[in-house]
Regions:
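Beta-strand/loop-alpha-helix module characteristic of Rossmann-like adenine-cofactor folds
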Residues: 2-5, 102-208
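Class I S-adenosyl-L-methionine
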Residues: 1-107, 188-191, 198-199
């Protein structure tokens, strides 16, 4: 059996159940070392491998999820697969569940989406949340949070999709770690840094 552990949003978010699963694992594999929550793995001092190289070898985001799932599945029983945020929200975990026909154990963690929604100020209201990797596949509405904005190119793709719906002059919040900055949408791909913790929120819908 393969176990999936959600590492949460930052160091210190790992649950005790997740911690014990990692410590008892025959092998530990981590989706990415670029997320802040990766510190929860390094703090345990266990041997592990990271799958960041698969990002570069994947031709599309759909291929990425399948390639990650394939790599984890091939490691076999006794493997613990660690992802940032809540494991149930991760698209590679969904692909792994399909590949394994549901024969995985999921230990959830602190939700990346919930943390971003709080920073965006959407608590207490209805909102839409979507990964930047799947944004082109859904019907957009606001309030909206788009997460997983891992690099400048992806931020540019997000900008174009949101501009088609809301207009490039629309004010949005650029979120990255503790930073929450209001910017016009057309500046989304001009920020200093990006990463697994980077996101953008649109507060209200102004249809073109």
């Amino acid at each position: 059996m393969i176990t999936v552990v959600g590492l949460g949003v930052e160091t210190g978010d790992l649950t005790e159940k997740g911690r014990q699963a990692i410590l008892k694992a025959e092998r530990v594999v981590v989706r990415t070392a670029k997320a802040a929550s990766y510190g929860n793995v390094t703090a345990l001092g266990v041997e592990h491998v990271c799958l960041d190289g698969i990002y570069e070898k994947s031709r599309s985001y759909t291929t990425l999820y399948k390639n990650l799932a394939k790599a984890v599945a091939e490691m076999g029983d006794g493997t613990v697969y660690c992802v940032d945020g809540a494991a149930s929200e991760d698209n590679s975990v969904k692909a792994l569940r399909r590949r394994m026909r549901g024969k995985i154990v999921v230990i959830d963690g602190v939700s990346k989406i919930s943390a971003l929604v709080e920073k965006a100020g959407f608590c207490g209201c209805s909102y839409q949340a979507a990964s930047a990797y799947e944004l082109s596949e859904i019907e957009l509405s606001a309030p909206l949070v788009v997460y997983d904005m891992t690099d400048r190119q992806l931020a540019g793709d997000v900008k174009l999709l949101l501009a088609d719906k809301f207009g490039e002059e629309t004010k949005v919040n650029y979120i990255n770690g503790d930073l929450v900055k209001k910017i016009p949408l057309f500046e989304l791909d001009r920020q200093a840094t990006y990463g697994d913790g980077a996101a953008v929120s649109v507060e209200k819908e102004e249809l073109l």
